[in-house]
């Protein structure tokens, strides 16, 4: 028997999977949010949690010179992001991985910027803050 969370996930992807974005946002809103981040290294290491198929990941690649690790639980979205990264010329800067944003299997304090555009609500604020400040 599936849980309500399983049902929500299935329903979410039925509705949003084929769309270019799986949540709110735009290149302009990403640029504005980045302007509030303060000074980043010239080539920042960015973690994009809950990246979906990567619309905001590409905005980050366009707006920074950084290397981006894009993480999402949905394998189909990650495959789409991998293919699009290569076709758009970002294959060396974007590494798309399947993983759990509530428990990313990544070394703590290894990123200059943690980004999550319209996804953290899925794990709750307390968990999201724990991920950002381990």
Segments from the language model and where they lie:
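N-terminal, positively charged/glycine-rich alpha-helical extensions of SAM-dependent methyltransferases
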Residues: 1-14
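Class I SAM-dependent methyltransferase Rossmann-like catalytic core
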Residues: 12-24
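Conserved alpha-helix/loop element of class I SAM-dependent methyltransferases that forms part
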Residues: 23-42
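Class I SAM-dependent methyltransferase SAM/SAH-binding core
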Residues: 47, 53-103
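A short acidic, Gly/Pro-enriched loop at the edge of an enzyme's catalytic core
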Residues: 102-113
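A short SAM/SAH-binding and catalytic strip from SAM-dependent methyltransferases
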Residues: 113-126
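A short glycine-rich, Lys/Arg-flanked "PGG" loop and its adjoining helix->strand segment in the class I
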Residues: 127-134
């Amino acid at each position: 028997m599936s849980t309500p969370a399983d049902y929500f996930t299935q329903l979410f992807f039925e509705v949003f999977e084929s769309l270019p974005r799986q949540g709110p946002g735009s290149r302009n809103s990403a640029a504005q949010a980045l302007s509030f981040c303060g000074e980043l290294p010239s080539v920042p290491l960015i973690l994009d949690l809950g990246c979906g198929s990567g619309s905001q990941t590409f905005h980050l690649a366009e707006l920074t010179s950084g290397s981006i690790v894009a993480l999402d639980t949905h394998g189909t979205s990650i495959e789409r992001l991998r293919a699009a990264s290569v076709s758009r010329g970002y294959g060396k800067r974007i590494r798309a991985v399947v993983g759990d944003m509530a428990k990313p299997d990544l070394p703590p304090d290894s990123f200059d910027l943690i980004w999550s555009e319209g996804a953290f609500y899925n794990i709750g604020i307390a968990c999201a803050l724990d991920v950002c400040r381990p």
